[in-house]
Every structure is written in structure tokens, then in C-alpha cells.
Amino acid sequence: MARSKIVKHIFVTGGVVSSLGKGILSASLGALLKSRGLRVAIQKYDPYINVDPGTMSPYQHGEVYVTDDGAETDLDLGHYERFLDEATSRASNMTMGRIYKTVLDNERRGDYLGGTVQVVPHVIDEIKARMLDLAKKGSFDVVITEIGGTVGDIESLPFLEAMRQLKLQLGSKNLVNIHLTLVPYIKSAAELKTKPTQHSVKMLLEIGIQPDILVCRSEHPLSKDIKHKIGLFCNLSDSDVVGLCDAETIYEVPLVLHEEKIDSLVLKKLMLKSPKPADIKDWKDFSGKVKFPKDGVVEIGVCGKYTKYPDAYKSIVESFIHAGAANNVKVKVRWMHSEDLEQKDCKVNEMLQGISGILVAPGFGERGIEGKIEIVKIARERNIPFFGICLGMQCATIEYARNVCGMEGAHSTEFVKKTKYPVIDLMEHQRSVKQKGGTMRLGSYPCILEENTNAFAAYGKNLINERHRHRYEFNNQFKEELSAKGLVIAGASPDGELVEIIELKGHRWFVGVQFHPELKSRVHKPHPLFISFVAEAKKFRDEMAVHHYETSSVETV
């Protein structure tokens, strides 16, 4: 069938409280529309004044998600990519900081012809132009735009005003606003309360926006009476009020929304026909594997410095869910704070009890670095499956240099500038860089794999492309010496100058990568390295169980 020439727009806003799951809602709706044969693009607008989240603390913002083209973006873009299996780009994430920067640059060039620069029209016009820009970058049927923040926040007002004007400009059949709210359950009264949702919609109405669809998060299903009440006070028909009951996993949300017929509702309001009915079989299969794994639980220790805030490692956690489903197991992450491992009274054996694999996570800064190096040593000496990502790979290199190659005090120049053995060093092109924001080696780069390695076995091919975010690299001055002692260069840049993957001879599964494989894992396409790592951890678990059984049997006799 012929596709509509007009791109349809869906704007997702949130009210009552933050962290309701606008990103998951947007990604889930996008996945449903894609399953109907529609081409979907998705973008996030963040109200903070930072240019991007690249320099923000993981404790405040969580993970920085890097795109193929090297943009440092909001972690919601990870949800978009994982759910839709579509690559995002720099154009997929916009901040108020970038908007203001553009407007000020325009003013300095004289683009406004001496006029007084104001929020309306100049800032709003720039926002509208950016919001429509993504639609021009491909032959899309639908563009979903998530607006960050909560309705009522002063920071989000320009984005909401831009949306209001766009709806007037494009027409109601070409732009739909879905408003996500909370319907809290009060245990003492044993009932759901609709008043917060009513007030949230009232705030939208005060700035000239009538939401087209309400999606109501709740602990319990919404009754027909509740939906009718919400619709009555929010100027909506009952069918425009969609219930979103809490799900066991985020991967059930597309199924819940499809059950509520939100995809059909959206298409009806946009007057858009889909090429085919929604196909959610893969989602049902995946959800079943996640909830009911056939082969039990595999516990993997993740060592990092931000473990008190798991959102800092969001893509790693999700990658384990994907790889676990592929291996018919549930991966249980046991967080291991790297600073705890530096304490003299650290009970390592207790910490490792039941662990079947160790992952040393990426990060920056000296804090906790010796703890990471210590856990690498333990994984190497005890032949525990090991996976090091970015800084984790660098820690593995340092540990091997110190404890196997006799390079006492070996380190990274990130932490010890004048170390005798700088096995990890600043990249040459980074030496003249002064600014921190957006200046690392960012984005997708090719890597050539060596055959007869765990990496090659996982990928099944020689050439791969992976995403990066780093300033420091393996120092090639020590490549020959480390290789002679059993360290394997399993992957490198096409020119051979940048070491991308290291492994160890004689170890069951020891892989360190300079890139970030977690950024390319998808719901229906788990990352090969995570699949391989979890598979080896599963084997380790089973072997330890047999060993424990045999040991117990001997002791009993």
C-alpha cells in the first residue's frame, strides 16, 4: 500500500511525578507501531541547560548513552534502540542547553537583524524546527517525541509551548499528545485516586494543551468507572483513557499496551492506516523467557564505583536480561562496590559465594581503581569467567602487567602520570584537548578480530563495529612484552594501532574490550559477547554445582 506523505507526530508528556516511565511508554508504542509495518523514528527532548549529559554525574543522570555518530545522550535512547532495534543519532536527543546555544550563536552572527531575542518567538521557533527536523532525515511514517520532565516544571514550558504551536500548525489529525500520569492506590482507603491526574491535565489546559490520550500508571487495573471519571474531568471519552498497570518487567509493557489497544487508538486519531496488524509474538516469547527461565539463575558480580545507583549501568543490566533469555537463564546481578574491595577487612570469599562470572564496569577517575584491579586478579587466578568493559579492560591490562609480567607499579597515566610502566596511556590526539565535553573518542569504529579467540567465536566474523567513549588506550610500547607472557590481542583497529580486545591464554573465558558492547544489545538481538559470557558463566555454575556435590558425597562417605 502507498504510505502517507505526511509524517505523523506523537508527543509523550508526563505529569504528577517524575520517573513514571515516559521512555518505556514511548519505546513500547514505537515497537508496536513498527510491528504493524510502519517506519518509526523517536527522539527525546530534555529540559536541562547542559549541552548534553556527557559531563554530568552518573549519580544525577545515570548512564550516558552513546550513539553510532558519537553523540552523548540520555539513557532513554537506549530504551528506544533496544525496543525498536533502530539506531538513533545526535538528532534524536535535544537539550534546552543546545537550543539556547544555537539561539545565542544566531544572535551573535546577526541572524535576527537587530531584533530583541525572546523566548517567543525565537527560542520556540528553534525548538519547533528541531522537533520537525528528525522527520526529514528518513522516510518515516511516525515520529515519537518524548518531552522530559514533569508538567508544571518551569524548565519544560518552552517545549510544551512548541508542541502546542505545532499542533495548531500541523493539525490535530497529524499530531497527538499522549499524557502519562499516576493514579495512586491508597491502601488505607483501598481505592485508586484520580485527583492527581485531574490536576496534571488541568496544568496542561492552563497552557492551552488538551491531551488526546491519557495513559494512567497504577498498581491495580483501572475499572470502567475510574476510566469514566477520569475522562469526564479531563475532557476525554472513556476509550481515550488507557490503563497501564505495573508490570513485572519493562518488556511486558508493549504487551500490556497492546491489550489496551493503544496502538489502534493512536492510528485512529492520526487517521493513519498500518500495512498489517501488530505482530507481538516475539515479545510474548521474550517475556516468557525472562519470567520463566528453563535453566534457573546465573549470578554475575558487577564491580564498579557507581553501584549504589544502578541506572549508571543501565545498558549492562539490560544486556544481561537479553543474554539471559538467549541462554534460558535469569541473570542475577550482584553489585560489588570497587572501594569495598580495597578494604583490609573485605571478605572476598563471602562476596564471591555463588558468583559464576565477574564483569568490571566502565568508569572514570581513580576512586576504587585498586578494587577493580584486585577483582580482576581474583577472576584470573580462580579461572572465573571475566568480562571487562572500557576501564574494565584497562584494569585487566594493568593487573596482568603487574602480577604476571613483573611490571611492579604498572598503571594508567590517567591515575599515575609518571608511572614506570604506563601500560595504559592517553591517546595521542587527546593530548592537546582542553575541554571535557564532547571531546573523547566517541561513536562507532571498526575492529578486526583474530581467529581462534573467544571474541571471534562469539561474533562469528572478522569485522565488527562497536561504540566507544574513552580518552585512554592500551600502550603499544608494551604490546610485545605482554603478548609474550600470554596476553592475546584478540581485536584491533584496522590499522592495528588501537588494541580493542584482549584475552588470556589458558583462561576459560577472559575478555576485555575497549568499546561498549552493552550499547548495541537489543531485545531480539542480544549482543554476541554478552551471550557468550553468560553461556560460559552458566557452564561455570553447573561445574561448581557438580564439584560441590562430588565433594559433599566424598565427605559424607
From Swiss-Prot:
It is an enzyme of class 6 (ligase). L-glutamine binds at Y59, G363, L391, G392, M393, Q394, E414, R471. It holds the Pfam family GATase. Allosterically activated by GTP, when glutamine is the substrate; GTP has no effect on the reaction when ammonia is the substrate. The allosteric effector GTP functions by stabilizing the protein conformation that binds the tetrahedral intermediate(s) formed during glutamine hydrolysis. Inhibited by the product CTP, via allosteric rather than competitive inhibition. UTP binds at S18, K193, T194, K195, P196, T197, Q198, K229. Pathway: Pyrimidine metabolism; CTP biosynthesis via de novo pathway; CTP from UDP: step 2/2. The active site is at C390, H516, E518. Residues 299-543 form the Glutamine amidotransferase type-1 domain. ATP binds at S19, L20, G21, K22, G23, I24, D76. Belongs to the CTP synthase family. NCBIfam families: PRK05380.1, PyrG. This is CTP synthase.
